[in-house]
């Protein structure tokens, strides 16, 4: 009996470590992806290096800060552990340097056109990766921090973690938030949220998280490929 209990404890600890490691990966992916997204919009708006840094950082940590305020984890994680802030700052500077180097050679119309296509593709990729990673991370953080199984709370915090940074980014850049336009954006989050919430009751949490992450990616790319949009 004691051996069985001992094995169960170790199994639970192993699962917790796996989930924690996966969430750390999601956190890094989301931080880099959203920092790229924010930095690129700042470049498009012809901001200076400081503006690029601000938009990169805000896009990266903004959703997580809102999440922490909602669930009562204060001060927000971005102040308790500045890892994401540092990652997003470095990413923003790297994006700025790459853009400056590339911009010196983008003189012909053909290269300028190619640059514009590359900009939109990279923006879509980074935004989608950040959206998927932070949506699942927001849900998992809520479940663990509040020890709750309330779907509406978990779903709301997951959604706001995913889209919050992008909303702040767009407002600072003087644009209508992307999530409020016709694009399949928050809708993709909802599919991932529902998938993760259902599956984590039946399969290992890290597997449920990966499937939820992939669902967000899949819906976003299918929407882009088939030009799905919400009516307006």
Describe the predicted segments one by one:
Residues 31-39, 60-61, 65-69, 88-101, ...:
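Transmembrane alpha-helical segments of multi-pass membrane transport proteins and ion-pumping complexes
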Residues 41, 49, 70-71, 75-76, ...:
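Double-stranded RNA-binding/processing signature
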Residues 2-7, 11-22, 71-79, 139-153, ...:
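Helix-coil boundary and interhelical linker segments in multi-pass alpha-helical membrane proteins
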Residues 80-86, 150, 181-188, 203-213:
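Loop-to-transmembrane alpha-helix initiation sites
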Residues 68-73, 97-111, 143-146:
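Transmembrane alpha-helix boundary signature
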Residues 21-60, 68-71:
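The feature marks the first
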Residues 19-31, 77-90, 149-162:
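Structural signature of hydrophobic alpha-helical transmembrane segments
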Residues 18-26, 52-55, 118-126, 176-185:
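Short, amphipathic, aromatic/basic-enriched membrane-interface segments that mark the entry/exit
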């Amino acid at each position: 009996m004691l051996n069985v209990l001992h094995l169960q404890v170790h199994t639970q600890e192993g699962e917790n470590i796996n989930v924690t490691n996966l969430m750390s990966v999601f956190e890094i992916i989301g931080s880099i992806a959203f920092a790229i997204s924010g930095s690129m919009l700042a470049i498009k708006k012809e901001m200076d290096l400081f503006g690029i840094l601000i938009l990169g950082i805000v896009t990266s940590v903004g959703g997580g800060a809102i999440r922490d305020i909602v669930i009562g984890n204060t001060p927000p994680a971005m102040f308790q552990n500045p890892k994401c802030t540092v990652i997003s700052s470095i990413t923003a500077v790297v994006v700025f340097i790459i853009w400056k180097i590339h911009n010196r050679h983008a003189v012909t119309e053909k290269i300028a056109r190619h640059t514009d296509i590359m900009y939109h593709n990279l923006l879509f990729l980074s935004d989608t990766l950040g959206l998927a990673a932070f949506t699942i991370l927001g849900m998992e953080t809520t479940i663990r921090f509040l020890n709750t199984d309330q779907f509406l709370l978990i779903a709301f915090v997951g959604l706001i973690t995913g889209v919050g940074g992008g909303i702040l980014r767009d407002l600072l850049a003087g644009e209508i938030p992307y999530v409020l336009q016709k694009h399949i954006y928050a809708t993709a989050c909802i599919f991932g949220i529902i998938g993760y919430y259902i599956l984590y009751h039946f399969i290992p949490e890290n597997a449920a998280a990966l499937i939820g992450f992939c669902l967000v990616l899949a819906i976003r790319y299918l929407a882009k490929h088939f030009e799905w949009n919400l009516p307006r």
